[in-house]
Amino acid sequence: MGGKWSKSS
């Protein structure tokens, strides 16, 4: 959880 989830959140 980091770049990928940051964009989604």
Curated annotation (Swiss-Prot):
Keywords: AIDS, Apoptosis, Early protein, Host cell membrane, Host cytoplasm, Host membrane, Host-virus interaction, Lipoprotein, Membrane, Myristate, Phosphoprotein, Secreted, Viral immunoevasion, Virion, Virulence. It comes from the Viruses. Residues 2-9 are annotated as: N-terminal. It is found in: Host cell membrane; Host cytoplasm, Host perinuclear region; Virion; Secreted. The virion-associated Nef proteins are cleaved by the viral protease to release the soluble C-terminal core protein. Nef is probably cleaved concomitantly with viral structural proteins on maturation of virus particles. Phosphorylated on serine residues, probably by host PKC. Coiled coil: none annotated. The keyword Lipoprotein applies. A lipid is attached at G2 (N-myristoyl glycine). The keyword Lipoprotein applies. GO terms for cellular component: extracellular region; host cell perinuclear region of cytoplasm; host cell plasma membrane; membrane; virion component. It is a lipid-anchor. The N-terminal domain is composed of the N-myristoyl glycine and of a cluster of positively charged amino acids. It is required for inner plasma membrane targeting of Nef and virion incorporation, and thereby for infectivity. This domain is also involved in binding to p53. The SH3-binding domain constituted of PxxP motifs mediates binding to several Src family proteins thereby regulating their tyrosine kinase activity. The same motifs also mediates the association with MAPK3, PI3-kinase and TCR-zeta. Belongs to the lentivirus primate group Nef protein family. Factor of infectivity and pathogenicity, required for optimal virus replication. Alters numerous pathways of T-lymphocyte function and down-regulates immunity surface molecules in order to evade host defense and increase viral infectivity. Alters the functionality of other immunity cells, like dendritic cells, monocytes/macrophages and NK cells. One of the earliest and most abundantly expressed viral proteins. Homodimer. Interacts with Nef associated p21-activated kinase (PAK2); this interaction activates PAK2. Associates with the Nef-MHC-I-AP1 complex; this complex is required for MHC-I internalization. Interacts (via C-terminus) with host PI3-kinase (via C-terminus). Interacts with host PACS1; this interaction seems to be weak. Interacts with host PACS2. Interacts with host LCK and MAPK3; these interactions inhibit the kinase activity of the latter. Interacts with host ATP6V1H; this interaction may play a role in CD4 endocytosis. The Z-84 isolate was taken from a 54 year-old Zairean male. This is Protein Nef. It comes from Human immunodeficiency virus type 1 group M subtype D (isolate Z84).
